[in-house]
Amino acid sequence: MGGIKEFLKHEASGGILLMIATVAALLCQNTFLSDFYNEFLKTKFTVSFGEYELSKPMILWVNDGLMAVFFFLIGLELKREVLEGELKNPSQIALPAIGAAGGLIVPAVIFYLFTKHDSFALGGWAIPTATDIAFALGILSLLGPRVPTSLKIFLMTLAIVDDLCAIVIIALFYTSELNAQMLAVASVCLAALFALNRLGVKSKAAYLIVGAVMWVAVLKSGVHATLAGVVAAFFIPLSFKDEPGKSMLKSIEHDLHGWVAFGVLPIFAFVNAGISLRGVGLDEILSPVALGTALGLFVGKQIGVFGFSFLAIKFKLAKLPEGSNFIQLYGIALLCGVGFTMSLFVNGLAYNDTDAFAYTDKLAILLGSVVSGAAGFILLKFSAKN
């Protein structure tokens, strides 16, 4: 339980910082600071390795680089949870897994219904399927002990399954033209990581160097670079035969949690949440992409997560989290509609980080997430009083 409590503590307080970063980005984009803010996002940074040079604007360093660290942490959490955590026991994973399935299917269907006549817009079908665990737990932290720990663990486990689905979606649907040479380099790195794991190598630096080379290769291959972080994490040893009490995975996970919660995600929010509200009217807000996104998050997520979970409990496929009731479960389902950073990330992949929809796609993510978060907070607070 200690690892779970630490996870909840970091994610919850990090969620509050995410809110501050979001407000800061909106203020920068919609005040006299807008020119400075946009120039900052376009500022190019170059890293050279002998003949090789990697030059990208700030926003792509964040989206491709820092977010790879975030997905690396997700990979570590997934591996630990599968081997010895909440995902090890099929009975414990049943309800969050079924809820996550509903939270994936229903929002995607809603988005499809609004955008089916526009093939480019339809490419964003996965945007409302995501859940921002940091933001959701940040909202839960404001309720303190009013919410049972079992529900917090349910939300955390559902978000982990949700992240796993996001990884698969990115790999299958948001991969551009492939570079065979770079994929070959990435494969060699993969083999090297496997060898390091099997040989019981205890040097974090060795894994870091091979992982960094693999990240560059994947970045150049056409596969999204964040997937390199996930794959690398799967080869970090959970324990060593000669030192069973020592865990490299848990050590790295512990060290990274703070950096990701208080650094990576707030920075990502700051560079991606700068939505221009100038000229945004009712027509833009009621556009197919905006409606599909906002309603997918607010309506689709709550119906999908709660509906599938309710049926699973009624058909005795799973049990209601200990010490909770259906009203509280519905409140958690509402919080799952807080897609924010993950939805913004998928949005960037779907529409190639362009402003093809004049920021209304991002505005819809913000609106859907805020309404979901507010509704979930109010319902959970009300249910605690009763």
Named regions from a protein language model:
Residues 140, 144-237:
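Functional cores that coordinate and move charged inorganic groups
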Residues 18-29, 70-76, 106-111, 189-195, ...:
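Hydrophobic core segments of alpha-helical transmembrane domains in multi-pass membrane transport
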Residues 82-108, 179-188, 277-303, 326-330, ...:
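Entry/N-cap segments of selected transmembrane alpha helices
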Residues 51, 55-84, 234-236, 260-280, ...:
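Hydrophobic transmembrane alpha-helices of secondary-active transporters
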Residues 2-5, 73-88, 137-148, 191-202, ...:
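C-terminal ends of transmembrane helices
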Residues 6-10, 27, 203-213, 217, ...:
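Predominantly late transmembrane helices and immediately cytosolic-facing juxtamembrane segments
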Residues 59-71, 119-134, 175-191, 224-232, ...:
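Structural signature of hydrophobic alpha-helical transmembrane segments
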Residues 28-39, 56-59, 73-88, 106-126:
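Transmembrane alpha-helix boundary signature
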